[in-house]
Structure formats: C-alpha cells, structure tokens
Swiss-Prot record:
It catalyses: 2-phosphoglycolate + H2O = glycolate + phosphate. Specifically catalyzes the dephosphorylation of 2-phosphoglycolate. Is involved in the dissimilation of the intracellular 2-phosphoglycolate formed during the DNA repair of 3'-phosphoglycolate ends, a major class of DNA lesions induced by oxidative stress. It comes from Pseudomonas putida. Its cofactor is Mg(2+). GO terms for biological process: carbohydrate metabolic process; DNA repair; glycolate biosynthetic process. This is Probable phosphoglycolate phosphatase. PANTHER family: PHOSPHOGLYCOLATE PHOSPHATASE. Mg(2+) binds at residue 161.
C-alpha cells in the first residue's frame, strides 16, 4: 500500500478462493479495506465478509489460505506502482540512503513482485509477513533493521500507510510519515497521528516538504560512512537467529 497498489490482484485471488469454496465473490473495495494485516487475516476476513473474523472456522481458514496463496502466486498483472515512488526511491539511492522494505505480505511474493515493478533493486533488506513471528504493529522489524544498518531511531524514518505502521514506528522511537493513500481499513491516516501526513512520496524531496514539519528526507542524507536508513513498509517476524539464516541481502 505504500509503494504499490496490489489490491486488484489480491481481490482476484480472494474471489478465486471464494469460488472454490462455493461462496460469492467479494467486492474490490471491501478487499481494499481488509488488506494490510497479512494473508491469513485477509483470508479470514474474506470468509467472514468483514473486518471481524473471530467466528471463522480454523480448518476452513487454513483451506482458504492454501487456495488463496495458490491463486495469488499465479498473477500480479494488475499491480501498479504509485505515482512518485520511483522518483523518490531513485533520489534516495543517489544520496546513499540505505532502504529496507517491511511488509505483511508473504515473503515468497515480496522480491519477485518488487522486481517485476522494477523497484526491488533499491532495497538492501526485504522482510515479509511470515519472515518472523511478529507482525506490525510490533516494532521488532524496525529495531532489527536499525541494528543491521547500524543506525539509531533518530537517524531513521518509517514511511507507511496504516495504523500498524504508525504504531510500529512509535514503539520503535522512529518518526513516521503517513500516506493518505494505501490501506488503512477505511480510516483516515490523520487519525493515527503520524509525525507527518502527505499525499505523495515526492512531498518529502528537497524543496517540496512543509518547513513546519521539521522532517525531510534530506535530513537523512547518508554520511560518508553511510549511517542512514529509511525503512519503508507497505509491510522482523521470526526469531533473530532464523532471520539471520534466511536474510535477503540486496547488493
């Protein structure tokens, strides 16, 4: 939701899953409100027909998840990059800023999807929703990225589009920029009180930011020893030792 709009493909996979289970398809806008908390929660919400999903049978949910994952793996043709994303990532890379992608999307889809969108090369680290046990709003992912990059919360910025992103950033002591587009279950991102709210990532580039905020990507420009990082969600969930064993390094 921060970098790409993958809802059309997610909705198509949800509908195929529901069809296999003999259920009516979901509305695209309903799926847009359901995404953001990982594939398991999305499937349970689709089966429940709403945000609340506690009553969904666990066996049915597992069956639905398998069908959904199979369907989603087959096509990402409807996914698009949001305006301003490539310009911003390109600028950051030129400044030597190290970037990480932290998403609740299943890990197996993350790198191939970003490479298909031609933005995977910008990220040194990629963390999927099943890489570690903890998902956002747990701050573990942010803390681990900062440890790997050798930076402090004051040197970092987290950019996201949801309540989970804002809560994770606050828990990690990192300033958070909230985007007005993306997936926040129909709630305005202003309600989550991030450090700054913008409509387009390019608003953070030099000369575009609001001086009153005191936050710019220029402030995070890397020093000669590259001690800066920007963690970009859309979406560190596993024990640290397992994470180290499976870590996705990007040259």
């Amino acid at each position: 939701g921060t970098l790409i709009d993958s809802v059309p493909d997610l909705a198509a996979a949800v509908d195929r899953m529901l069809l296999e289970l003999g259920r009516p398809p979901a509305d695209l806008e309903a799926v847009r409100h359901w995404v953001g908390n990982g594939a398991q929660v999305l499937v349970r919400r689709a089966l429940a027909g709403g945000i609340e999903h506690d009553a969904v049978d666990d066996v049915l949910a597992e069956q639905g998840l398998a069908l959904f994952m199979e369907a989603y793996a087959q096509s990402h043709e409807l996914t698009v990059v949001y305006p301003g994303v490539k310009d911003t990532l390109r600028w950051l890379q030129k400044q030597g800023v190290e970037m990480a992608l932290i998403t609740n999307k299943p890990e197996r889809f993350v790198a191939p999807l970003l490479d298909q969108m031609k933005i995977g090369r910008y990220f040194r680290w990629m963390i999927g929703g099943d890489t570690l046990p903890q998902k956002k709003p747990d701050p573990a992912a942010l803390l681990f990225v900062m440890q790997m990059a050798g930076v402090t919360p004051q040197q970092s910025l987290f950019v996201g589009d949801s309540r989970s992103d804002v809560l994770a950033a606050k828990a990690a002591g990192v300033q958070c920029v909230g985007l007005t587009y993306g997936y926040n279950h129909g709630r305005p991102i202003h309600d989550e009180t991030p450090s700054l709210v913008i409509d387009d990532l390019r608003a953070l580039l030099p000369g575009c930011e609001d001086p009153a905020t005191g936050i710019t990507l220029a402030d995070l420009q890397a020093s000669q020893d590259r001690e800066s990082t920007v963690a970009v969600t859309g979406k560190f969930w596993m024990k640290v030792i397992k994470a180290l064993a499976r870590w996705r390094w990007r040259a």
